[in-house]
């Protein structure tokens, strides 16, 4: 079974979830009440997750007598975009916020646990494992398909699908894997501003060989609309997560630009895809 619970709506905290109070219940680390509706809503997310995990912990798994559902559930926690507000408190070391092609618009936390499948052990006493592999939420299609042993749809034809989905299951298990092919975050923050030079920008994001480090090349709106390549900005995220130093005009990075442009050219158009046929 698949479930995707979310607490997106309404955009104010509930009075309570079951027997757990929410509105007016959020506290700082000191234990003092925050008296903040926004922080109550953040706390509601914590309550949602805790209640779900508690249910999985106490419910027997009918597929595996003697075990609870938590052991054989692939639990994923993430967000569909960056922080709503442009604030150091919300976005930390990242530039911009929700809707932007900069890292603050789409770089989000991602947590995974599946004890029976070798993804963590589900114990709070055990330190988690970190992974710096490039990942996109559309990768969850291929990841779940591999976890349940199902093939992906074809890349062409009437029933095609998952053309930009790459399984992250091996990386979740801690195995060494080849770098993921490029991803293409886009910008809907500026896309509706018809007078903006930055409307509908797209970025090419890659850690793949022959690149050394985490690189990101920005293309203007002509890529999204006409598949034309007009680079605007280049950042080395390994050293510049804030995206503050544009390296595009530095000749020593011309090969990086060339590689990323080729990635964009390959993926352009209605027939473009990043998943290889063997995936």
Please annotate each region the language model reported:
Residues 30-37, 77, 89-95, 114-129, ...:
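Flexible glycine/proline-enriched surface loops and loop-helix/loop-strand junctions
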Residues 21-73:
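A long, amphipathic alpha-helix that forms part
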Residues 1-3, 42-45, 49-52, 74-79, ...:
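Beta-strand elements within well-structured catalytic alpha/beta cores of enzymes
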Residues 1-38, 84, 91-92:
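Active-site His/acidic residue clusters
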Residues 36, 43-51, 105, 135-142, ...:
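A structural signal for well-ordered alpha-helical segments within the folded catalytic domains
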Residues 10-12, 47, 55-123:
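Histidine-centered active-site microenvironments of extracellular/periplasmic hydrolases
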Residues 83-103, 126-129, 133, 138-237, ...:
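C-terminal cap/loop subdomain of S1 sulfatases and analogous C-terminal strand-loop tails that border
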Residues 228-232, 237-279:
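Long, internal low-complexity/basic segments
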């Amino acid at each position: 079974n698949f479930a995707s619970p979310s607490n997106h709506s309404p955009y104010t905290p509930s009075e309570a979830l079951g027997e757990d109070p929410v509105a007016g219940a959020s506290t700082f680390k000191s234990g003092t009440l925050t008296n903040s509706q926004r922080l109550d809503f953040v706390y509601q997310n914590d309550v949602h997750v805790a209640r779900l995990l508690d249910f999985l912990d106490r419910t027997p798994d009918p597929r595996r007598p003697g075990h609870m559902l938590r052991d054989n559930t692939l639990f994923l926690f993430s967000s569909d975009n960056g922080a709503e507000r442009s604030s150091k408190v919300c976005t930390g070391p990242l530039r911009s916020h929700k809707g932007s092609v900069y890292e603050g618009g789409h770089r989000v936390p991602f947590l995974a646990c599946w004890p029976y499948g070798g993804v963590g052990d589900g114990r709070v006493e055990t330190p988690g494992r970190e992974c710096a592999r490039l990942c996109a939420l559309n990768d969850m299609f291929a990841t779940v398909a591999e976890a349940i042993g199902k093939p992906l749809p074809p890349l062409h034809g009437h029933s095609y699908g998952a053309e930009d989905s790459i399984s992250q299951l091996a990386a979740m298990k801690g195995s060494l894997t080849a770098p993921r092919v490029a991803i293409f975050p886009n910008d809907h923050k500026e896309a509706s501003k018809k007078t903006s030079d930055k409307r509908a920008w797209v970025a090419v994001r890659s850690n793949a060989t022959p690149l050394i480090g985490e690189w990101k090349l920005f293309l203007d709106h002509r890529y999204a609309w006409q598949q034309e390549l007009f680079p605007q900005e280049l950042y080395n995220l390994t050293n510049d997560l804030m995206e503050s130093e544009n390296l595009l005009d530095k000749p020593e990075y011309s090969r990086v630009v060339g590689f990323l442009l080729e990635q964009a050219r390959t993926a352009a158009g209605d027939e473009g895809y990043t998943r290889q046929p063997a995936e």
